[in-house]
Swiss-Prot record:
SUPFAM superfamilies: ARM repeat
Lineage of the organism: Eukaryota, Fungi, Dikarya, Ascomycota, Saccharomycotina
InterPro entries: ARM-like, ARM-type_fold, Importin-beta_N
Gene: NMD5
Name of the protein in its database record: Nonsense-mediated mRNA decay protein 5
Function: Active in protein import into the nucleus. Its major import substrate is transcription elongation factor TFIIS.
SMART domains hit by this protein: IBN_N
Subcellular location: Nucleus; Cytoplasm
UniProt superkingdom: Eukaryota
Something else known: Present with 13500 molecules/cell in log phase SD medium.
Pfam families, alphabetized: IBN_N (PF03810)
């Protein structure tokens, strides 16, 4: 490998000239396939004379090659330069050189170290657990012995990555870890506490801070998922806990506190040491030393030691930190505050520790929660200049990591939920007194007072559900409180207060206001906010959500009905400005509520929504095609989840609009035309996330029209094109596509019989799906649903080669599963139905094929003995009756002999009669299901059973013991007595064969009794002997059923 030439290539990748860069990348692509390339990269990175920017370029290329090529199962990068695996013969050389290179550049090129660390992580995670890097641990320990802390840092990096490999394993899966902890953790702790930390002696040294942070994270890696037995012992836990506490308590040096940029200050290694020390102690408490219904690990001795020997003293440390922070004596990063508040919240949940926290609740509320919920200068700036960020952070739409205000809200809600008897009244009293002192003249409130009001209202918004429940002692006071302290701020000069009032109103849907003035005031306030002159997005958005809450209120609805169109236009505008599914949900409810008024504007609405969807979908598609390797780190990759949810919401709204035109076929066709560009973009660009909604639209439009329009046929063509692509995911999402295909087969069957072009599309979809790798029984069930519908739709127009393929696939599956046909009921009945469907059109060919494949006997034995007596679905009963009638009518006596089915003949009359007689019951059941579904929505006066949501105040049950502990004991006792083993019975029953009341079937229009009577009459005419034979074998009860059907 020519190092000089390679060096020149890396230099040229940084050239401003695109042609030069492209040429260099081509040379690198070729060079990367030559053994020794990665070693040459490391030589360049380690060379002192190479400029920093070229070293960094080589480091990034090396890192990407390792990321995508080290593991045999590594995903391939979208960058073709990276689509090659590392030569196994080169791996030992790379591992040896990598650590030496990192040591070499640790002083001079810290940016390269950060990049190479990613490569180190990949290699260690792959090779250390599989024992392919035997000298890694001793080499790392050797580096730790070096007096040069830059060298030590590399050694600790290696150790951290070694211990990271144990992070997600249970103790029984990592027994070798216990030995490592015994051998090395005492020395590691000593090095961290007595050499590096030394009671804060070197807290002005960031390099040492990085080393201490790595030691703390090593502890985190081994204790995060499970707690090693060695670390559960007092002699191990206590010194580590003391080390963490000493770091938490040690004041930060003035040089750190002098950093004005809070974000930069928070990234200081010593600040992060405090964060991870708090995180470790919180995790130990929450996961291993608490009582919880979801607690996986039962380490009672550790729990007792933590709570009795450590928790009380540490809680004093926590309170001391909070007190100093509250009085301005101590600065805490957001992350530290987050973990402190989480720790206190966990203490609230536990009965024993609540006794320690409870007496301090008022102080915590007034001096911690209240100030944290006051908007900061940054928050106010976001309200004006970055409204989407403000909404996500302050309106409970988005749980941002390490946000102290959200942690404060979580603490507050836990207090009032779990300890409401103690906390609700003082919380309400504090809100009232603060609001009274802060309000004064509503029309002239100073900013500082407005911030206090916002904090109070945010508290109220978070606990309102506890205050307005029927059993709340404060429920009767809430109307007056809302009228006095909430609704006046609709007219506030501060937009953030208007937004908060709307937010609160959106949570008042369960209240029955006795004073009609309240609803009128809410209507006027919400509509004014929705159409506010300042066009404040947070105000408009929360107003829309409040509107959604009251949209079904009679008084509110009556007023709103006069302004339907302009309100809908405003919602559309909001949907365009705010990328979230929140507004889509409002629009969907609005369309359903005011469908009649919106009908004249249906097509215009659809066009607007489709344009909005396309704008989002194009952005999402472009982002999905970005090369992830072009981003320097994971945080740089754009998060498009909000756009995706917004797009899904818009598609759902288009379906709601469609459904509102049930009785207007011409408008429905226009709506289909308007929707087509959305379907075309989804299917042509393989946007899998929207397949289901696209097919739902087709399902609903075809159902409402009872016809397949040219637009729907074009969509089928697009599905076919999508399916033919080599990397198509149509098979994977077949259950979604079945929504459209099912109705195309039902309402387009006449066209399908004439037009082989469309039939071929559906058959190709089937073909690709049935041969997909790793098909589960559930996947095959969907495939066989499609095949039987294809058979029934085409009837005798089904091409013979198609029938042969369909039968071959399903019979092969039946034979493969022959020992589980009675247990895998859902799959097996579906597979049998493919065969039965073929019997309806070609009974003799189908039976001959079963015999040829050695499947005839097992088929009839299972069908007649196990399935037919247990059928409950209309579809199964109809299908089998039709097939049995065809067998009776179409087969000659000789056919029965050749097939060895003579013994079946005497039974056929009884079987088909009994089965047909069960159809009315099945039809009634299906009709009831449809009736129940149509009336299952919540009525206007439907209320939640508030006791259902009430977990109770644990502080009310002190005398009887903690409810959680009692429930845990109950579960334990039941488990011990073997009342349940695995929670469910693996054997399926015919109850698992659900009949969807909303999904149509080709057999829906078939009058089975009419077919029955015509078939029997025809048999009597053409073969009176067989007719008499059938009647002769009927029991008196069967004869009565038979005559009842014939006379129906």
């Amino acid at each position: 490998m020519d190092i000089t030439e390679l060096l020149q290539c890396f230099a040229c990748t940084l050239d401003h000239n695109a042609a030069v860069r492209t040429n260099a990348e081509t040379h690198l692509k070729n060079a990367s396939k030559v053994p020794g390339f990665l070693g040459a990269c490391l030589d360049i990175i380690a060379a002192d004379e190479v400029p920093e920017n070229i070293k960094l370029s080589a480091s990034l290329y090396f890192k990407n090659k390792i990321t995508y090529g080290w593991s045999a199962g590594a995903r391939q990068g979208s960058n073709e330069l990276l689509d090659s695996h590392v030569d196994p013969d080169e791996k030992p050389v790379v591992k040896d050189m990598l650590i030496k290179t990192m040591v070499s550049v640790s002083k001079t090129s810290p940016r390269c170290i950060r990049v190479l660390k990613s490569a180190l992580t990949v290699i260690i995670s792959e090779d250390y657990p599989s024992k392919k890097w035997g000298n890694l641990l001793p080499n790392s320990l050797e580096l730790l012995a070096n007096e040069d802390i830059t060298v030590t840092y590399v050694g600790l990096l290696c150790l951290a990555e070694i211990f990271r490999t144990y992070r997600w394993k249970n103790n029984d899966e990592r027994q070798d870890l216990e030995e490592l902890i015994l051998n090395y953790f005492p020395a590691l702790l000593n090095y961290g506490a007595n050499v590096l930390f030394q009671d804060g002696k070197y807290m002005n040294n960031e390099q040492i801070g990085e080393l201490v942070k790595l030691i703390i994270k090593i502890y985190k890696f081994v204790s995060y998922h499970d707690l090693p037995f060695t670390l559960q012992r007092s002699e191990s836990f206590t010194p580590w806990a003391c080390f963490f506490v000493s770091i938490i308590q040690q004041p930060l040096p003035q040089e750190v506190l002098a950093i004005s940029d809070i974000e930069v200050r928070s990234k200081n290694p010593w600040v992060k040491c405090k964060k991870w020390a708090l995180a470790n102690l919180y995790r130990l408490f929450q996961r291993y030393a608490s009582t919880s219904l979801t607690r996986k690990f039962q380490y009672d001795e550790f729990k007792q030691m933590y709570c009795e020997e450590f928790l009380t003293q540490f809680l004093q440390v926590v309170f001391d930190q909070i007190e100093k922070w509250g009085t301005g004596q101590l600065w805490l990063s957001d992350e530290c505050l987050y973990y402190i508040l989480n720790f206190v919240e966990q203490c609230v949940v536990q009965k024993t520790t609540w006794k320690l926290v409870g007496p301090h609740y008022n102080v915590i509320l007034q001096h911690v929660i209240f100030p944290l919920l006051k908007p900061t200068a940054e928050t106010l700036e976001a309200f004006d200049n970055d409204p989407q960020e403000y909404i996500n952070r302050n309106m409970d739409f988005w749980d941002v990591g390490y946000s102290p205000d959200l942690a404060a809200l979580a603490l507050l809600t836990t207090c009032v939920t779990k300890r409401g008897k103690t906390t609700l009244q003082p919380t309400l009293e504090f809100m009232v007194s603060t609001l009274q002192s802060a309000v004064g003249d509503y029309n002239n409130i100073m900013l500082d007072n407005a911030l206090q009001i916002e904090s109070c209202l945010r508290i109220f918004s978070s606990i309102i559900d506890r205050l307005i429940t029927k059993d709340s002692p404060f429920a009767s006071e809430m109307e007056k409180f809302i009228l006095t302290y909430v609704l006046p701020f609709f007219k506030s000069q501060y937009g953030f207060l208007q937004s908060r009032v709307c937010d609160i109103c959106s949570k008042l849907g369960s209240m029955d206001f006795k004073d009609p003035v309240i609803t009128s005031t809410i209507y006027e306030g919400v509509m004014n906010c929705l159409n506010n002159s300042s066009n404040s997005l947070p105000v408009e958005l929360t107003a829309a959500l409040a509107l959604q809450t009251f949209i079904s209120d009679d008084q509110f609805n009556m007023k709103l009905s006069e302004h339907v169109v302009p309100t809908m236009q405003k919602l559309l505008s909001l949907s365009n400005d705010f990328e979230s599914d929140v507004i889509s949900g409002v629009m969907q409810d609005f369309v359903e509520q005011f469908a009649e008024q919106l009908q004249p504007f249906g097509v215009e609405l659809m066009n607007t929504l489709v344009q909005q969807f396309l704008k989002l979908a194009i952005d999402l598609h472009e982002t999905s095609n970005l090369d992830p390797d072009s981003f320097t780190n994971v945080d740089s990759i754009p998060d498009e989840s909000d756009k995706q949810m917004a797009a899904l919401g818009i598609l759902s709204t288009t379906i709601s609009i469609l459904l509102s035109f049930e009785n207007s076929p011409e408008i429905l066709k226009n709506l289909e035309q308007s929707f087509y560009p959305a379907a075309e973009f989804i299917l042509k660009n393989d946007i899998e996330d929207f397949y289901r909604e696209c097919c739902e639209f087709v399902e609903n439009s075809t159902f409402l029209l009872r016809d397949i329009t040219p637009i729907s046929w074009k969509i089928l063509e697009l599905i076919g094109e999508c399916n033919r692509k080599p990397d198509s995911m149509v098979s994977y999402y077949l259950s979604d596509f079945m929504l459209a295909l099912n109705n195309i087969l039902i309402y387009g069957r006449n066209e399908l019989k004439k037009n082989e072009f469309y039939t071929k599309i559906i058959f190709e979809i089937y073909q690709k799906a049935v041969t997909a790798e790793d098909n589960s029984l559930d996947d095959l069930r969907v495939v066989f649903d499609l095949s039987q519908e294809l058979v029934l739709a085409l009837d005798d127009s089904l091409p013979q080669q198609y029938r042969e393929r369909l039968l071959a696939d399903v019979v092969g599956s039946i034979l493969t599963q022959k020992n589980e046909l009675k247990t895998n009921v859902v799959f097996s009945v579906t597979a049998f139905n493919v065969v039965i469907s073929n019997m309806i059109t070609e009974p003799l060919i189908t039976l001959q094929y079963l015999k040829q494949q050695g499947c005839l006997e097992i088929f009839f034995q299972t069908w007649i003995t196990d399935y037919i007596p247990n059928y409950k679905r209309c579809y199964d009963i109809k299908l089998s009756v039709l097939a049995l009638l065809k067998i009776i009518l179409k087969l000659e006596s000789n056919d029965y002999s050749v097939l060895n089915l003579e013994n079946l003949v005497p039974q056929l009359g009884s079987i088909v009669t009994q089965l047909a007689s069960r159809l009315p019951t099945a039809l009634r059941q299906l009709a009831n299901q449809r009736k129940e579904f149509s009336s299952s929505g919540f009525e206007e006066d439907t209320k939640w059973d508030e006791n259902f949501l009430d977990v109770g105040d644990d502080d009310e049950n002190d005398d009887e013991g903690d409810l959680t502990e009692k429930y845990l004991e109950l579960i334990k006792n039941r488990a011990d007595s073997l009342d349940f083993v695995d929670g469910y019975d693996a054997k399926e029953t015919f109850d698992d064969l659900e009949e969807d009341p909303l999904t149509g079937s080709i057999l829906d229009t078939v009058d089975v009794y009419k077919v029955f009577k015509e078939s029997i009459a025809n048999l009597q005419h053409v073969d009176s002997n067989r007719y008499q034979g059938i009647l002769r074998h009927l029991t008196p009860a069967d004869q009565e059923l038979f005559m009842g059907i014939m006379n129906a």
